[in-house]
């Protein structure tokens, strides 16, 4: 990771945090009525009967986040072909750690939340916000070795893959087989353009990807799946920055960290404190998310990394201390944008959404703060 990219990650993390803070301030000020317009102003896209009519909040969550998952897909494809995921030996431990980091928070949440009305939120504390995490890693600089950062990124990649699967399987509320079939045809068209006709024009995949996204929204499956599958269909060539996948990933990166994620954070993090008491922190849903992110994530990930290191099943881990592994396990508890995103998909009740936002913010802040403290002040030998 070059110096300029490190600066981008740091600045992106700060902008993301500022956007979330601004949302909370605005939603608890005289400007709150304007903030509410995100859910009252509708925008239409389409012609005649082929129209998508959604409010601004939905456009952000279904449109901008589909672009974010397109970027994630491009990143994962590169890692599978030429990156850390191209070697099986580099995959096994981070994959199992990511799974444990998904399972443990979910189990903690479900152990606290037995009401059928809130069980659907089990996946909220299972996510990791890679943008925020990379921002803190950039802030730590050389205190975190490059290989340790690579381990965090690899775990986060598997976390993202799991999140995509969870959204597609568990948060699809209705299904139109006709629209889904049409979307699948556009995906197949991209595969044919790539594998058979060897078309390398990015614009072709952008147009076909847009129609795949449009059909996916109409089908009832969440649009993020269209973004991810589109990425897997785009041609990638090693050592060629002009290949469509490389070009699109490089082009999207600044838009993701400086615009898309901050806009999402601003739209979804606006906790309203009106009528809320301190006791909301101890409501089952809030407590389940806080403990899931802060306790479940670190417990699940660190236990796997430490045990595999002890058994010498984790070659890369031998160069790290247990404190370093514990520090990055804490950072993986920063759920923020991804946790908020799953929360919005799971519920639409205002009180529950407020409880979710508080749980996500508190759990993420605790994880980020203590992860930073461990890696910055307690780890004595970062090399």
Curated annotation (Swiss-Prot):
Molecular-function annotations in GO: sodium:proton antiporter activity
Compartments where found: Cell inner membrane
UniProt catalytic activity: Na(+)(in) + 2 H(+)(out) = Na(+)(out) + 2 H(+)(in)
One of the GO BP terms on file: regulation of pH
S-S bonds: none
Principal location: membrane
Annotated transmembrane regions: 10-30, 56-76, 91-111, 121-141, 150-170, 174-194, 206-226, 254-274, 275-295, 327-347, 355-375
Entry keyword Nucleotide-binding: no
Record key words, sorted: Antiport, Cell inner membrane, Cell membrane, Ion transport, Membrane, Sodium, Sodium transport, Transmembrane, Transmembrane helix, Transport
Record InterPro entries: Na/H_antiporter_dom_sf, NhaA
Role description: Na(+)/H(+) antiporter that extrudes sodium in exchange for external protons.
Family, per entry: Belongs to the NhaA Na(+)/H(+) (TC 2.A.33) antiporter family.
PANTHER family: NA(+)_H(+) ANTIPORTER NHAA, SODIUM ION/PROTON ANTIPORTER NHAA-RELATED
Name recorded for this polypeptide: Na(+)/H(+) antiporter NhaA
Organism: Francisella tularensis subsp. novicida (strain U112)
């Amino acid at each position: 990771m070059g110096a300029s990219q490190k600066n981008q990650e740091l600045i992106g993390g700060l902008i993301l945090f500022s956007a979330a803070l601004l949302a909370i301030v605005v939603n608890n000020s005289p400007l709150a009525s304007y903030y509410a317009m995100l859910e009252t102003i509708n925008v239409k896209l389409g012609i005649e009967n082929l129209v998508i009519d959604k409010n601004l909040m939905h456009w952000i969550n279904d449109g901008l986040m589909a672009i974010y998952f397109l970027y994630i897909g491009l990143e994962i494809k590169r890692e599978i072909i030429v990156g850390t995921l191209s070697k099986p030996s580099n995959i096994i431990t981070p994959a199992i750690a990511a799974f444990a980091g998904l399972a443990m928070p979910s189990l903690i949440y479900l152990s606290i939340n037995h009401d059928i009305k809130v069980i659907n939120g089990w996946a909220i504390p299972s996510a990791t916000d890679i943008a925020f995490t990379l921002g803190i890693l950039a802030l730590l600089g050389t205190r975190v070795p490059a290989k340790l950062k690579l381990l965090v990124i690899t775990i986060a990649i598997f976390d993202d893959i799991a999140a995509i699967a969870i959204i597609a399987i568990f948060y699809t509320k209705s299904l139109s087989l006709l629209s889904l079939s049409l979307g699948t045809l556009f995906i197949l068209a991209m595969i044919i353009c790539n594998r058979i006709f060897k078309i390398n024009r990015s614009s072709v995949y952008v147009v076909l990807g847009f129609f795949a996204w449009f059909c996916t929204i109409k089908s009832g499956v969440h649009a993020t799946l269209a973004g991810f599958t589109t990425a897997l269909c785009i041609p990638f060539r090693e050592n060629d920055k002009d290949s469509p996948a490389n070009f699109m990933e490089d082009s999207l990166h600044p838009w993701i960290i400086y615009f898309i994620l901050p806009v999402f954070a601003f739209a979804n993090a606006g906790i309203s404190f009106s009528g809320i008491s301190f006791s909301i922190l101890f409501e089952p849903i809030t407590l389940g998310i806080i403990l899931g992110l802060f306790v479940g994530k670190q417990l699940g990930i660190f236990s796997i990394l430490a045990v595999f290191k002890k058994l010498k099943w984790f070659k890369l881990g031998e160069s790290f201390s247990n404190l370093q592994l514990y520090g990055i396990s804490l950072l993986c508890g920063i759920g923020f944008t991804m946790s908020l995103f799953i929360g919005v998909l799971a519920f639409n009740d205002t009180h529950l959404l407020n409880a979710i936002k508080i749980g996500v913010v508190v759990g993420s802040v605790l994880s980020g703060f203590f992860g930073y403290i461990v890696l910055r002040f307690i780890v004595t030998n970062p090399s």
